[in-house]
Amino acid sequence: MAVSAVPHPSKQAQASEEGINQEKCINEEYKIWKKNSPFLYDLIITRALEWPCMSLQWYPEQQIFAEHGYTEQKMFLGVRADVGKYLLAVASIQLPYLNQTVPPTTMEGASAGDESSLRVNISNLYSHPESVCSAKLMPQDDSCVATVGNYHNDVLVFDKESFESYSSASESPLKPKYRLTKHTQPCTSVCWNFLSKGTLVSGSQDATLSCWDLNAYNESDSASVLKVHISSHEKQVSDVRFHYKHQDLLASVSYDQYLHVHDIRRPDASTKPARSVHAHSGPIHSVAFNPHNDFILATCSTDKTIALWDLRNLNQRLHTLEGHEDIVTKISFSPHEEPILASTSADRRTLVWDLSRIGEDQPAEEAQDGPPELLFMHGGHTSCTIDMDWCPNYNWTMATAAEDNILQIWTPSRSIWGNEQLEEDATAYLS
């Protein structure tokens, strides 16, 4: 019998029909979500970008225009403009001024409803020399950004001079201040140190991590910035994160299903993690430390779950969050509320979890909608969510970007999260 890579015609027809049915289902779900969104959100902004957004991050500062009833926030984006063409962009986003009495606002495209003049504008575009899968602003100096991409092995660092000297009239891309070279395969993630200015870590498909110190840069010796090169994983490193309160601690996760915690002060740091745990039954995609708690971190995986861990005892998982129907791609703790965690997935959903509700009694009819700790489900995207970020200046406000070029900024309704008990129970999940 001949073996063919081409599906049988009947199978092709079946697959085509299934695809059409799935698209219809997605469209129906979106219509239901859009109809109900005024009751679910205090704010929802939808902006169709010209290109897919591969990476997004809010700037920490804001400008307040109280007399006009809005503030202007900025967001840094990494986008794929075309085949072989990549851009970095700055978006200016107007959000309702918090001291104003602003009704729930739904915005489609670049403008809001009848009363609002709020806008989302792309204010700056910069040609990037390589692909961009992650772009991160330095916490101590947001004019400095580090980027990594799917098709090149280096970490590129751009400073204020890089952006100021850029000419949009020229066909030349941005010139990096530093090109950090060590990895032998494309990088997947990058993270700045929150306490040590100029220190960053990168993870790569070559199964290694590199920790860099830009303060040690020597023009005659480019390798001088490499602080430590870590070879502890067996497969692709998918995410890396520095601890918020300990500058020498960082975590890495990999397709080898392991979570590693590294102390870069150790003499054997280059080959052996300080802590290691087989964390999931499938490749791990993201890791996140809790910025409010020294010991809590989370991981997420292809196995559709999110795992909670305590650094003091990684031998035992604290809890498993189950609610996604596909690969969980990214997780992030709220910068404002200790027990709040958000997760994105290939199932097109962004879930918001309240860890203080773990173990609460739940009526049977509510259990059908998910566990008690599942606080909110954002269903505004019709394709896989690529990236997300909490707004640093607005509590409970997030930005999410999907494969279909849609950028959304949203705040769940206060009726959902405005629970006085939340603050009292902020650390209940640790007990």
UniProtKB/Swiss-Prot annotation:
Protein name stated in the entry: RbAp48-related WD40 repeat-containing protein prw1
This protein's record includes keyword Hydrolase: no
Segments annotated as WD repeats: 127-159, 182-213, 232-263, 279-310, 323-354, 380-411
Compartments in which it is found: Nucleus
Entries under InterPro entries matching the protein: G-protein_beta_WD-40_rep (IPR020472), Histone-bd_RBBP4-like_N (IPR022052), WD40/YVTN_repeat-like_dom_sf (IPR015943), WD40_repeat_CS (IPR019775), WD40_repeat_dom_sf (IPR036322), WD40_rpt (IPR001680), WD_repeat_RBAP46/RBAP48/MSI1 (IPR050459)
Keyword entries, A-Z: Chromatin regulator, Nucleus, Repeat, Transcription, Transcription regulation, WD repeat
GO MF assignments: H3-H4 histone complex chaperone activity; histone binding
Organism of this sequence: Schizosaccharomyces pombe (strain 972 / ATCC 24843)
Role played: Has a role in chromatin assembly and chromosome segregation. Involved in the deacetylation of histones.
